[in-house]
Amino acid sequence: MKNTSLYNEHQHTLPGPDDITRHELGNGITVLTRSNHNSPTLSIKGYLKTGSLLDPNDKLGLSYLTASGLMNGTAQHNFQSLYNEVESVGASLNFSAGTLTTSFSAHCLREDMMLILKLISECLRSPTFPEKDFNRQKNQMLTALAIRAQDTAAMAALLFDQIIYAGHPYARPEEGFPETIQTITREDTVQFYKDTFGPEGMVVAVVGAIDPETAIEALKGTLGDWNNPNQQLLPEIPTIGPIQKTTQKSLSIPGKSQADLVVGCTAPERLSPDYYPLQVGNNILGQFGMMGRLGKRVREESGLAYYVYSSLSSSWGPGAWEMIAGVNPQSVETVVEMITEEIREFVSEPVTEEELSDSKSYYLGRLPLLLESNSGVAISLLNLEHFKLGLDFFQTYPQKIQAITAEEILLTTRKYLNPDQLAVAIAGP
């Protein structure tokens, strides 16, 4: 296979069982570490098993507001002194909420690791959620949602989720709606924190200029005795089938000069054997080069899109396969038809051997680039743990990609992508 020299050159330096240390603390926290002494910095990333999946329907955005409030104050620091501590050593620290997890990310020098870990521990174990800061962030959230309501791309994506995930928790936006944010009180965030934050299922990755034993001992000292016996766990994620016929939803946003659209369907979860064939197929359909076949047809040859590409997203539970475009409002129906035609062709015959070879080379060639920084490695370690992929994932990944055939892509694609059963979401003037 051509263009795999970058992977072959760096294969021996990719993270694996020989240089990843995995350790479980007594309270349920999993620690993953990898040393890299080429620079004096550390990347510290982690997640807790709490997110918007636990939000009540009438208080969507609660997990988002709770995560946003973790750095507003702790039992030891107020908002300003906490940020001063971080900035005084040139470090960074932030928290954010997703559907299934609440994440944190920090970057610092090796000698400042204990300071940053202590601050992470404070924010997770003793946040105070001051009323004035809660009100400020609530207002900021309402402003962000007002901006979202005028964003054609964001609203098309929201509409798309409501079609393919109808009746499913994934149809709900993590940020909620203005009417749900309005109902949330400081007391709600305090209670959500007490109910759902804890060490069970928590994962921390430390990558950089540190020995594994030192990192593990530091985490034992800062988070090893944290417990929440009443920690609420995430519910089982329900399954969902494909929509039975093409369904279109449109949202009018007056005054806009561009329309955004999303066409697509549900996709398998991350651990499905269908994931890799679809990943390579998606690259051919709307990613590789100038955004694959979609980019060539809709943008290059027809000139009808400002941008067009496809995206395959998979996690736990049902995923999504989206074809996304920004177009002149007068071209919406034409572009939807073109995308549908490309989908129909894509499921009618195998991809070419050249397309398959190029796509495989792309995935193998980019892997070392994704893992060249401490941050990239830390993110990857979290993914290995989150999806139970195994510490040897990067050593076995090439075989998985190289084994994919054009016929396998065709048969797998047909299981999900049906040109007569598409979700079509449009937002524009």
Give the location of each predicted region.
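Non-catalytic beta-strand/loop surface segments
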Residues: M1-N57, N72-M114, N135, A144-E200, ...
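Active-site SXXK
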Residues: G61-N72
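Carbohydrate-associated surface elements
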Residues: A209
